[in-house]
Amino acid sequence: MEMEGMEGAILIFMLGNMEQTVARKQTKREKNNAQKRTEGWKQKGIWLFWYAVVPVFAFYLMECYEHNPFAEVRVGAQLFNIFLFELIGWMLYFLTGRMCFASRVLYGLAVAFGITNHYVMKFRSTPFVPWDLFSAGTAASVAGNYDFTPDRRMVIVTLVFIALFVLTCLFKKAPRFSWKIRLGSIVLVGLVLCTFVNALQQESFQTKHYLYPFLFTPAYMTKVNGMAVTFAMDLAYVAVERPAGYDADEAKETLAKYETKTTETDTQDLPNIIVIMDEAFSDLKVLGPLETNEDYMPFMHRMQQGEKNTVTGYVQTSVCGGNTADSEFEFLTGNTMAFLPNGSIPYQQYIKSRTPSLAGYLKSLGYATYAQHPYQASGWNRDKVYPLLGFDNLDFMEDYRDVSYVRNYISDASDMEHIIETYEKNKASGKPAFIFNVTMQNHGGYTDTYMNLTNDIQSQYASEPLNQYLTLIHKTDQALENLIDYFSKVDDRTIIVFFGDHQPNDTVASVVENGAQVETQKRYLVPYLVWSNYGIEGAKDKNTSLNYLAAQVLTAAGVPTNAYQNYLLSLSKTYPVISAAGQTKGIGADEKQLQTYKKLQYYQLFEKNKEKDE
């Protein structure tokens, strides 16, 4: 019995020791695992820290394509840009699960955005904005005529980006998170990103944090806010909000006050109306001294002195260096870009159904309506928009025959011959003709040399791009003189309207500015001319803006005007000029008048056409 007791005690002792040994080993194993987990998270933390640096480099280098962000982007805005880049960077990482790939995508986006903005600024003098994405096709169609040679800054910044791109291979060793962690992180980062972008678009947030909010000066806005923050702020304006206090019935009541009755007598013997919106036609003397070996627009300058049956002056546009379609929009509709997002393109964004315009109105009076452009039909969506504006006959480059070229474009001389051919063909219809022609000859850029163009006009500046531009303007001036000479000999009553769509880009204009501080609105002035082969009241130095010009032309021509045009004529007495580039106030100007105009424009552009279609 005693032996059995001793054996039991020994067994219990041995089992106890075994349990203690197992417990010690388990504790040691748990400690080791805990240490490994701690070390793992430390390693992940280090990798995450280095990945967090990637968006910072991406932001500053992207800005360096255009300027020095450390000196010119406001401090608070720099932090907001970095935060925006961080959110995008982390979203890419959690979506892909790979630091190396995500960082390369982020750098690639920064390079693409930076280079695109640089060239848009170079060629158009305004920054890249969200709605430029709608214009990608048009931009591609004319890209071959611009000089894309990279400057020193671009080369250096791109080389640094390439070096960083190569270094991202170090991230291949970075650990990965489970899909559960990634999914939760995607949702969290997405919510923060949406909330932050929304905050950037709020006026109170912009004011509190000293963000520059004025779309009127987009280049400065981008410079002090940074590209990413400005782009996020601009997203709020992709769609046009209803004006405060807007009511469709109230807009209709307001227009009804300007309605006039049109009788059959009013529509008898209506004149042909020919409108030529000439590509980049301008007189750069408005920017500074400009001396040349011969007058670059002798005919226009002569007409500006006060010719019989002629109205001349300067018309203020809303665009500079590009976005031709916005000038078309203002002239044809009577609407102003001042009430639409900066850089937006109504042809591509807003005109999706029948829209009131000069063409549609003249068609209702019995006119045959023609839209002509000696280039690709798809440019600015014209082939789809023109019919919605009331044009029944469309001519694009494939419809032109036996033409001459200047550089790579159909010449203005051939284009104006096409106008004459259209007029002659239209006579058989017995209807007056409304011909709206948008030329192409003078389109930028102006840096390349061509076998079919010699720069005959030479200025005091050592700038061949400027000399080429002035030579092109001289050719246009000759073509215009020939056109008016032809119609001065025809019996049919005809009125010709001629104006430029905008001034050329900074490559040319900055030469004449010659470093001087030029009033902003002068950069948006182009000459215009209204001439007839019958009696109209002549005038010179009569300045206006494109939204008014069509109504003023109809009045000069003796053609009845509709309610909206009558309203514009009334408004022009207190606000002689309204464009996205600014306003000119007259006697009796009142901010309430602008608010009324904004409401009526919204009705014309977004509501009136819907009512007719219902």
Give the label of every model feature segment:
Residues 198-275:
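Membrane-interface segments at or immediately adjacent to transmembrane helices
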Residues 259-267, 277-278, 283-614:
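Solvent-exposed soluble domains appended to multi-pass membrane proteins
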Residues 124, 130-133, 219-229, 233, ...:
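Membrane-interface micro-motifs in multi-pass membrane enzymes
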Residues 34-45, 78, 270, 282-286, ...:
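Helix-boundary/low-complexity linker signature
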Residues 13-221:
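Transmembrane and membrane-interface helices of multi-pass
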Residues 59-76, 82-87, 91-103, 108, ...:
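Hydrophobic N-terminal alpha-helices or hydrophobic patches in metabolic proteins across all domains
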Residues 1-6, 14, 18:
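Methionine residue identity
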Residues 11-14, 279:
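PLP-dependent class I/II
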